[in-house]
Each structure stands twice: as structure tokens, then as C-alpha cells.
């Protein structure tokens, strides 16, 4: 019995390639389905289907929305981020980078809570407040990026009954309990899921 090895047709075997941790899925407590989306050899994505949503991956990373400038982070429990007109909603997942001073938050993912127009609190994936009282004081700079996702009609229980077919930038998705859906990519962070309107003829 061989484990973590690749057997070649001519008889030899070699150690299998390694894997890379890219990101935690949206909901680690429930099943998630990964479906490939390949437009060309240079434009390939991985689609993460979870309960009522899809997230997107490319080039070993999550697809993120545009930069939101951070102008302050409190040393408090919970940590409160100031970012003018950020546009986030409670429960959004964001990645923070490029902060000077409070570097403990850099490169990490947080859930957004306690949203106001210009501020939001940081919690971890379990919804526990991020206590930044022991962090280095915020100095300057920093950006946040929301993890890009779209909503779907597919529940966790339905994910593995999905059938799909792709043509160029369009994927057709079927499930016995739902209308046929068309997933379209028009830009890196512009994906839409719409009902297919069949015409008699």
C-alpha cells in the first residue's frame, strides 16, 4: 500500500505534490463543494459552493473586492476599525493588510460586526470579539478587502445534487428543486447568477 505517492505507468513511484492552505471556507461546520471554472489555460477559477452562497478563488487566493482605506483601529475589546463609507454589512468577511503599528491584524481574516457608516468591529470566524488591548498601537495606513461572494438558492443539503456545464464565461447549473441557473462572469469581481428563461419554439 502506498500513501502520498504517485505511481507512474512504467512502474516507478514518486512523492505526490504538496498542497497549500489558501483560506478557510465560509462555513467549516457544514459541507462545502468545490467546482472548477476554466475559461482558458490562463483564466481558471475554483468556485466554493456553501449554504446559499458562492465564493471564488484564482491564483491561489480568494477573489476580494476593492480596497477600503483604514484610518484607525482601537486598542479595545472589541477592536473597532475606522474606514470612511466602507459599505460593509454585519457578517461580511474581510482581509486586513498594510497596517502600520498594529501589525497583529495584517494578513488575517475577520468577520464584521457592529457596523456604522464609518466604523466596524472585528470578530473571529466564530463571532468572538477580537480583543486588541494587547496589540501594538495603530500607527497609520492599512486597507481592508471584503471577500467577494454572491448568493444562490442552493442549501448545504442540495450542493452535491448540483449538475453543471460550462461554455466560455458561462456555466449552467441544474438542481431538481430549482430553476436552471446561469452563472456568468463579466469581470474578475463581477459574477451573476440568473434564472434561465427558456423559450418555446
What are these regions (language model features)?
Residues 61-166, 175-179, 198-200:
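Small/polar beta-strand repeat architecture
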Residues 27-41, 152-167:
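Structural signature of eukaryotic scaffold interfaces centered on beta-propeller domains
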Residues 1-66, 178-201:
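N-terminal beta-propeller domains
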Amino acid at each position: 500500500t502506498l500513501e502520498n505517492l504517485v505511481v507512474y505507468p512504467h512502474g516507478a513511484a514518486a512523492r505526490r505534490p504538496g498542497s497549500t492552505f489558501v483560506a478557510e471556507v465560509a462555513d467549516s461546520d457544514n459541507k462545502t463543494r468545490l467546482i472548477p471554472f476554466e475559461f482558458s489555460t490562463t483564466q481558471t477559477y475554483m468556485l466554493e459552493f456553501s449554504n446559499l452562497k458562492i465564493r471564488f478563488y484564482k491564483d491561489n487566493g480568494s477573489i476580494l473586492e476593492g480596497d477600503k482605506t483604514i484610518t484607525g483601529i482601537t486598542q479595545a475589546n472589541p477592536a473597532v476599525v475606522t474606514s470612511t463609507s466602507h459599505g460593509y454589512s454585519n457578517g461580511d468577511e474581510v482581509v486586513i493588510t498594510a497596517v502600520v503599528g498594529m501589525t497583529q491584524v495584517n494578513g488575517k481574516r475577520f468577520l464584521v460586526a457592529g457596523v456604522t457608516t464609518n466604523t466596524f468591529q472585528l470578530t473571529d470566524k466564530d463571532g468572538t470579539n477580537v480583543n486588541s488591548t494587547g496589540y501594538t498601537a495603530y500607527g497609520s495606513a492599512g486597507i481592508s478587502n471584503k471577500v467577494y461572494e454572491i448568493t444562490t438558492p442552493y442549501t448545504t443539503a442540495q450542493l452535491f445534487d448540483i449538475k453543471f456545464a460550462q461554455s466560455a464565461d458561462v456555466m449552467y447549473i441544474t438542481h431538481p428543486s430549482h430553476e436552471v441557473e446561469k452563472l456568468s462572469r463579466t469581470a474578475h469581481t463581477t459574477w451573476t447568477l440568473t434564472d434561465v428563461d427558456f423559450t418555446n419554439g
